[in-house]
Amino acid sequence: MSSILPFTPPVVKRLLGWKKSAGGSGGAGGGEQNGQEEKWCEKAVKSLVKKLKKTGRLDELEKAITTQNCNTKCVTIPSTCSEIWGLSTPNTIDQWDTTGLYSFSEQTRSLDGRLQVSHRKGLPHVIYCRLWRWPDLHSHHELKAIENCEYAFNLKKDEVCVNPYHYQRVETPVLPPVLVPRHTEILTELPPLDDYTHSIPENTNFPAGIEPQSNYIPETPPPGYISEDGETSDQQLNQSMDTGSPAELSPTTLSPVNHSLDLQPVTYSEPAFWCSIAYYELNQRVGETFHASQPSLTVDGFTDPSNSERFCLGLLSNVNRNATVEMTRRHIGRGVRLYYIGGEVFAECLSDSAIFVQSPNCNQRYGWHPATVCKIPPGCNLKIFNNQGFAALLAQSVNQGFEAVYQLTRMCTIRMSFVKGWGAEYRRQTVTSTPCWIELHLNGPLQWLDKVLTQMGSPSVRCSSMS
């Protein structure tokens, strides 16, 4: 490898030799971009080597990388080490690497806990896991520490382990098939959905039991366990609300099925685009639908061209746009980052203004009214959908009949407004009264529902305007 910088120490060259390349890309095409990436990687490794030389942990890092052994020791750096790099703070969105964004609460720390190397920031363990193990890594949500890691990121210690072999990739749990009675009737009329569009939804603030991004966001648990956003907080929520949770349901322990029926397994399959996003201003749809293929994407207010990981609203035009909408659009800023990791969907507020989310799946988990709107403050993160919880509800609903399954269609739609909220506590009482909002359709669950409904056939009792 040719020297990119004036001098590259031998240990840096050795460590860079173990760098994983993304999809084996290289050669012609994108040469300038690849060159910039190589230069950035070299700077990131140099910065780490310089720090580890002071603590004597450099040999352990090299041992872990060359042997690819998880039984090596922790390789730690200060968890608030932004000051180490001594580089300027980026001024524009193009200079930021928001992947794995992480912010400490202003009350607890003044530094944001991320490393900054040549105008790009990221969580230290994410940076080096991406460098030496998984080039396609998007977020810390995709990682969980091994059991014997004493300084894992989630432990929130003063030192954080950056040994890439002390972390594992979170696997997406396999959802069990739903057993549906074989049906031959052709569906000719769908029952009406419960419609909360024109009712005034309740409001709630960011759940007290869910810690903001300044604290540990739990790792996605192994298959078979439906996670919540904090063990103690869930207990408090369940005690105070005294309501059932999808986490308590299991497709294998629901009410018994009549096995004399001819049951057909209907399996879940992952679509090419996990969600579709439509943007609205007041009650008017603006622009084309965005189809999300990547597990991490941002919806922001900037004017850069959209790509597979970014839906930019700034370029969208609307001849009917009024002054309120214009002002709101200016405050969207960095917007929201959406993650689809391990069968769970997270929404993280990157904007300086709050976002407001209406997620029936999330509301059901906490025992709230299905139409409740939750305010997510800047720097905070909320799980807004859980595939395993949805699978349990679907299996239960099949036993309750066609209409119960069809009602789950609403759970697959999530509405989210920027800057301005709506509901009983706000001047705007419907989402179509908010200046700027988006609607997410979760394609995997929707397609699963469609297959189940097709298998079930038509409802036993026709629903009409007279019923």
Curated annotation (Swiss-Prot):
Residues reported to bind Zn(2+):
C74, C149, C161, H166
Residues bearing N-acetylserine are S2
Q: Where is the composition biased (Polar residues)?
A: 207-217, 233-243
- Which cystines does this chain contain? none
User: Which UniProt keywords are given for this protein, alphabetically ordered?
Assistant: Acetylation, Cytoplasm, DNA-binding, Metal-binding, Nucleus, Phosphoprotein, Transcription, Transcription regulation, Ubl conjugation, Zinc
Which SUPFAM superfamilies does this one have? Answer: SMAD MH1 domain, SMAD/FHA domain
Residues with the Phosphothreonine modification = T8, T220
* Chain location of the short sequence motif PY-motif per the record: 221-225
Organism listed in the record? Bos taurus (Bovine)
Q: Any idea where this protein resides?
A: Cytoplasm; Nucleus
Query: What quaternary arrangement does the UniProt entry report?
Result: Monomer; in the absence of TGF-beta. Heterodimer; in the presence of TGF-beta. Forms a heterodimer with co-SMAD, SMAD4, in the nucleus to form the transactivation complex SMAD2/SMAD4. Found in a complex with SMAD3 and TRIM33 upon addition of TGF-beta. Identified in a complex that contains at least ZNF451, SMAD2, SMAD3 and SMAD4. Interacts (via the MH2 domain) with ZFYVE9; may form trimers with the SMAD4 co-SMAD. Interacts with TAZ/WWRT1. Interacts with FOXH1. Interacts with SNW1. Interacts with CREB-binding protein (CBP) and EP300. Interacts with SNON. Interacts with ALK4/ACVR1B.
Q: Describe the processing and modification events after translation.
A: In response to TGF-beta, phosphorylated on the C-terminal SXS motif by TGF-beta and activin type 1 receptor kinases, phosphorylation declines progressively in a KMT5A-dependent manner. Phosphorylation in this motif is required for interaction with a number of proteins including SMURF2, SNON and SMAD4 in response to TGF-beta. Dephosphorylated in this motif by PPM1A leading to disruption of the SMAD2/3-SMAD4 complex, nuclear export and termination of the TGF-beta signaling. In response to decorin, the naturally occurring inhibitor of TGF-beta signaling, phosphorylated on Ser-240 by CaMK2.
Principal location class: cytoplasm
- Looking at the keywords, is 4Fe-4S present? no
Q: Which residues form the MH2 domain?
A: 274-467
Task: Extract the Pfam families matched here.
Answer: MH1 (PF03165), MH2 (PF03166)
Ranges where the record places region Disordered? 207-251
Name used for this protein in its record:
Mothers against decapentaplegic homolog 2
Q: Which residues carry this modification: N6-acetyllysine?
A: K19
In alphabetical order, the GO MF annotations are: DNA-binding transcription factor activity, RNA polymerase II-specific; I-SMAD binding; metal ion binding; RNA polymerase II cis-regulatory region sequence-specific DNA binding
* Protein family per UniProt: Belongs to the dwarfin/SMAD family.
Q: Domain MH1: where?
A: 10-176
One GO CC term on file: cytoplasm
Q: Which GO terms describe its biological process?
A: activin receptor signaling pathway; anatomical structure morphogenesis; cell differentiation; odontoblast differentiation; positive regulation of transcription by RNA polymerase II; SMAD protein signal transduction; transforming growth factor beta receptor signaling pathway
Keyword Ubl conjugation set for record: yes
**Where are residues bearing Phosphoserine located in the sequence?**
S240, S245, S250, S255, S458, S460, S464, S465, S467
